[in-house]
């Protein structure tokens, strides 16, 4: 029994005035007491305010036009994918808002998204920017690290842990975040035929992902790793988490051509020099093609929105280097400006960077490594040289044939 040390009377809750005899438990602090009933009431008030705040966050979701306009500031090209994603995200968060406001009981089903596109076409970048526009927690997972329960590798619940960590362990915020699962094509079944051997990183992972994609209460180990009976879990409802999956799906164009009856593929076709056929084929991908590729029907059913990203051209890469708000060249210009040096890339140099990325088949993802290699030596020298005013990068600099031109 808590007692007041001055008069030896039973402790009294500083908030409601009840004594410890009238409540289940009493928590003491320096000169104050609070009973379990007041703690529960305070928690109820906080929960109500949190829900109201969460509802408020999604009453002003940007319109699809506003989402695309913002994406255009950072992402070059991929107009069809932007439009599809903008509508899907807008409808998703309208659905979230409806579920928070306890509308008329009409249940709106979740529509997760599948992005198909070559390496370096901007799948991850699009998902990242969507999360930034909406100001929601975002996490990226690699499907190739996942295995079904009981095998060495990551459980699918670890994907949710990454989102929870990025939400600073705020479960309410995490439950309305976005998760992007990359390399989803790598967990396709190895063949359409049933095998007696286990496919622990393929179909088994697809099966394990079904529940969290659809919406379930998942038990997430707060420290990650495998589950064990003595471990405490954090429960996360995945119903309002938007899942975006993406993959290159190498070879799917062949499946599309075969389905459409186009048999023009052969040794005489130089696909590296022709982009238009690939673009039209990518836009004609349907769920049937994903099924033939190795995704199981149940998994495809959880991804009702399917959109394709185009292979980036050399012209696209030039624009990516120069146009967006955070364009790569602008980033390096800002870096050297801290040393009071201006940086100029000649037009031919920019085109050569884009050309090398196309040659290496790395898309936009490979641009930074090329620019970094071009800039490394001069960025090493600039801090030690007080008289450098301007650095000019030429085509020969990019090719490694000459050093940058320096103006002093």
Swiss-Prot record:
A GO biological process held by the record: proteolysis involved in protein catabolic process
InterPro entries: AAA+_ATPase, ATP-dep_Clp_protease_ClpX, ATPase_AAA_core, Clp_ATPase_C, Clp_protease_ATP-bd_su_ClpX, ClpX_bact, P-loop_NTPase, Znf_CppX_C4
CDD domains registered for this protein in UniProt: RecA-like_ClpX
Binding site for Zn(2+): 13, 16, 35, 38
Entry keyword annotation includes Glycosyltransferase: no
Gene3D superfamilies: 1.10.8.60, ClpX chaperone, C4-type zinc finger domain, P-loop containing nucleotide triphosphate hydrolases
Domain of life: Bacteria
Example GO molecular function: ATP hydrolysis activity
GO cellular component, one term: HslUV protease complex
Keywords: ATP-binding, Chaperone, Metal-binding, Nucleotide-binding, Zinc
Domain ClpX-type ZB span(s) in chain numbering: 1-54
Annotated residues for binding of ATP: 118-125
SUPFAM superfamilies noted in UniProt: Glucocorticoid receptor-like (DNA-binding domain), P-loop containing nucleoside triphosphate hydrolases
Pfam families per the UniProt record, alphabetical: AAA_2, ClpB_D2-small, zf-C4_ClpX
SMART domains: AAA, ClpB_D2-small, zf-C4_ClpX
Family: Belongs to the ClpX chaperone family.
Function: ATP-dependent specificity component of the Clp protease. It directs the protease to specific substrates. Can perform chaperone functions in the absence of ClpP.
HAMAP family: ClpX
Quaternary state and interactors: Component of the ClpX-ClpP complex. Forms a hexameric ring that, in the presence of ATP, binds to fourteen ClpP subunits assembled into a disk-like structure with a central cavity, resembling the structure of eukaryotic proteasomes.
Name of the molecule in the record: ATP-dependent Clp protease ATP-binding subunit ClpX
Origin species: Ligilactobacillus salivarius (strain UCC118)
């Amino acid at each position: 029994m808590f007692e007041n040390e001055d008069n030896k009377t039973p402790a009294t809750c500083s908030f409601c005035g009840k004594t410890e005899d009238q409540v289940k438990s009493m928590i003491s602090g320096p000169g104050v007491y609070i009973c379990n009933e007041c703690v529960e009431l305070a928690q109820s008030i906080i929960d109500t305010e949190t829900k109201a705040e969460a509802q408020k966050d999604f009453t002003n979701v940007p319109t699809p036009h506003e989402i695309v306009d913002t994406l255009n500031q950072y992402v070059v090209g991929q107009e069809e994918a932007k439009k599809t994603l903008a509508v899907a995200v807008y409808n998703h968060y309208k659905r979230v808002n409806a579920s928070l406001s306890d509308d008329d009981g009409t249940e709106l089903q979740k529509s997760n998204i599948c992005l198909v596109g070559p390496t370096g076409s901007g799948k991850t970048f699009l998902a990242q920017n969507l999360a930034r526009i909406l100001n929601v927690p975002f996490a990226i997972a690699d499907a190739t690290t996942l295995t079904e329960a009981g095998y060495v590798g990551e459980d699918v619940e670890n994907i949710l842990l990454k989102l929870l960590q990025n939400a600073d362990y705020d479960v309410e915020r995490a439950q309305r975040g976005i998760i992007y699962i990359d390399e989803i094509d790598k967990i396709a079944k190895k063949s359409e035929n049933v095998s007696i051997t286990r496919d622990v990183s393929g179909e088994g992972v697809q099966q394990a992902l079904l529940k969290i994609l659809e919406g379930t209460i998942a038990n997430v180990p707060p420290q990650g790793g495998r589950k064990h009976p003595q471990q405490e879990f954090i429960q996360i409802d995945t119903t309002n988490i938007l899942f975006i999956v993406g993959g290159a799906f190498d070879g799917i164009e062949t499946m599309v051509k075969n389905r459409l009856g186009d048999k023009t593929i052969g040794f005489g076709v130089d696909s590296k020099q022709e982009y238009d056929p690939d673009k039209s084929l990518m836009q004609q991908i349907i769920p049937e093609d994903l099924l033939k590729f190795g995704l199981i029907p149940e998994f495809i059913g959880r991804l009702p929105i399917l959109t394709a990203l185009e292979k980036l051209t050399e012209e696209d890469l030039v624009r990516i280097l120069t146009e967006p708000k955070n364009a790569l060249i602008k980033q390096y210009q800002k870096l050297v400006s801290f040393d009071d040096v201006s940086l100029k890339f000649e037009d031919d140099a920019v085109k050569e960077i884009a050309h090398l990325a196309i040659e290496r088949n790395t898309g936009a993802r490979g641009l930074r490594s090329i620019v970094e290699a071009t800039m490394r030596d001069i960025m090493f020298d600039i801090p030690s040289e007080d008289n450098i005013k301007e650095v000019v990068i030429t085509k020969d600099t990019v090719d490694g044939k000459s050093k940058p031109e320096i103006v002093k």
